[in-house]
Amino acid sequence: MMVIRPVERSDVSALMQLASKTGGGLTSLPANEATLSARIERAIKTWQGELPKSEQGYVFVLEDSETGTVAGICAIEVAVGLNDPWHNYRVGTLVHASKELNVYNALPTLFLSNDHTGSSELCTLFLDPDWRKEGNGYLLSKSRFMFMAAFRDKFNDKVVAEMRGVIDEHGYSPFWQSLGKRFFSMDFSRADFLCGTGQKAFIAELMPKHPIYTHFLSQEAQDVIGQVHPQTAPARAVLEKEGFRYRNYIDIFDGGPTLECDIDRVRAIRKSRLVEVAEGQPAQGDFPACLVANENYHHFRVVLARTDPATERLILTAAQLDALKCHAGERVRLVRLCAVEKTA
């Protein structure tokens, strides 16, 4: 059974294995053991209440409960940009016009921005390619909404998610090659590694401070602005169906889109509810997959179960209850895994 749980110190080697499979561009999951260990420690201290809000971040893993295999990772930053500035570009417009010459040009322009400062961030989503089946990707991504719904006071009103931009298998980023490299004088992979290992001072020191006309970039770079890596397209679709939208903010490195949503408008958060759980044999039928989570802050768990999402009394097997670390008579959080598709 696949289970979402908080990260543990013993997971570092498994996270290193996952990091080696990302193919680059996932800044928050570098293949650096010291950095990953520090990330785990920060998550543990967050759960223990030992960190200020500016440093808090939760990390979860997807585990096969039968074998102990860690198949994926996901995380939430509580409030970005309160310690180090959180940069992105806003894609806007500058108009150059002359009535005398009968010239009017509206030019797409990149403006350096810190507009998302203080927002909660969904980040570090990666599922081992060997485990991309049977709803694991949906479980991994959406489990975070169950945690946010249960512990709403821990998070801010706006949630953002940076999507990985277009990068090829050799680590080549058209956006970086045409823009970032001119200011940073290093390859994308080097800048990505420095950022991922916490060495972010160079961003503020070297970033261009003035607006940049996108027409000055290569056509290849212009074409990838706001576009996602092919492997990230499913993750983007998942978030958009939960209510997230692209509002013309992009990553300063690879040009990937930043999606955002008010936390209380996220479908899985808004529609999740608490129901009593009982032990037994679940009813047979053509039921949809649902997310089921306990309400235990320190021992949070999420699993998938096929059931009626409108039920008031959820029947789970002994194995499912054990995976959730809860008992009959307790209350669990329930929501349909995917939104019901509207038909004409």
UniProtKB/Swiss-Prot annotation:
Species this chain originates from: Shigella boydii serotype 18 (strain CDC 3083-94 / BS512)
Active site: H229 (proton donor)
Similarity section: Belongs to the arginine N-succinyltransferase family.
This protein's UniProt keywords: Acyltransferase, Arginine metabolism, Transferase
Reaction equations catalysed: succinyl-CoA + L-arginine = N(2)-succinyl-L-arginine + CoA + H(+)
Name this protein carries in UniProt: Arginine N-succinyltransferase
UniProt record, GO biological process: arginine catabolic process to glutamate; arginine catabolic process to succinate
Broad EC category: transferase
Residues annotated to bind succinyl-CoA: L125
EC number: 2.3.1.109
